[in-house]
């Protein structure tokens, strides 16, 4: 049976423990995701308190991180999602995504509606990927893929 969280507190506290143990043990997010059968981005989001993990994946990552059975159970609970408090984000990396949506949000909306019609792109039936690629002009570039199912608005 699935269980859900009433507040984000328990999962946030567990996320703090995950981050501390990950650093102590010298593990990467990829190390933790390997062998779960799940995407790196999904496992990372789950360990940061934004998704529930299937039992086998929860047991695997908990074992790697030295977490107890209560943590295994907590990793399987449906969280109260949303890791950014209200208002404009202050973390520079997160703010850049906010800025991107400020600049390109209306463009994305216009193009989605023109190509698909009235509706939304799901963040539930969704895949996220990030790749580091070399920039021909020097340095690196981040290629971020947001892959969500289109859900049309249904008149009623």
Swiss-Prot record:
Catalytic reaction annotation: cyanate + hydrogencarbonate + 3 H(+) = NH4(+) + 2 CO2
Lineage, opening ranks: Bacteria, Pseudomonadati, Pseudomonadota, Gammaproteobacteria, Pseudomonadales
Biological process terms in GO annotation: cyanate metabolic process
Transmembrane helix listed as a keyword: no
Molecular function per GO: cyanate hydratase activity; DNA binding
Family listed: Belongs to the cyanase family.
Keyword annotations of the record: Lyase
InterPro entries linked to this entry: Cyanase (IPR008076), Cyanate_lyase_C (IPR003712), Cyanate_lyase_C_sf (IPR036581), CYNS_N (IPR048564), Lambda_DNA-bd_dom_sf (IPR010982)
PANTHER family: CYANATE HYDRATASE (PTHR34186:SF2)
Encoding gene (name): cynS
Protein name in the entry: Cyanate hydratase
SUPFAM superfamilies: Cyanase C-terminal domain, lambda repressor-like DNA-binding domains
Residue numbers annotated as active site: 96, 99, 122
Enzyme Commission code: 4.2.1.104
Function as written in the Swiss-Prot or TrEMBL entry: Catalyzes the reaction of cyanate with bicarbonate to produce ammonia and carbon dioxide.
Gene3D superfamilies recorded: Cyanate lyase, C-terminal domain, lambda repressor-like DNA-binding domains
């Amino acid at each position: 049976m699935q269980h859900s969280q009433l507040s984000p507190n328990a999962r946030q506290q567990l996320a703090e423990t995950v981050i501390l143990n990950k650093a102590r043990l010298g593990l990467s997010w990829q190390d933790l995701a390997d062998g779960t059968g799940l995407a790196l981005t999904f496992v990372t989001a789950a360990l940061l308190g934004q998704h529930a993990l299937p039992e086998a994946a929860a047991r695997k990552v908990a074992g790697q991180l030295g977490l107890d059975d209560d943590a295994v159970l907590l990793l399987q609970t449906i969280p109260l999602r949303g890791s950014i408090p209200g208002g404009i984000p202050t973390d520079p990396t997160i703010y850049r995504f906010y800025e991107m949506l400020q600049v390109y949000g209306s463009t994305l909306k216009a193009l989605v509606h023109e190509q698909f019609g009235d509706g939304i792109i799901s963040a539930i039936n969704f895949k996220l990927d990030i790749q580091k690629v070399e920039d021909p002009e020097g340095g690196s570039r981040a290629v971020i893929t947001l892959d969500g199912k289109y859900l049309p608005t249904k008149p009623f």
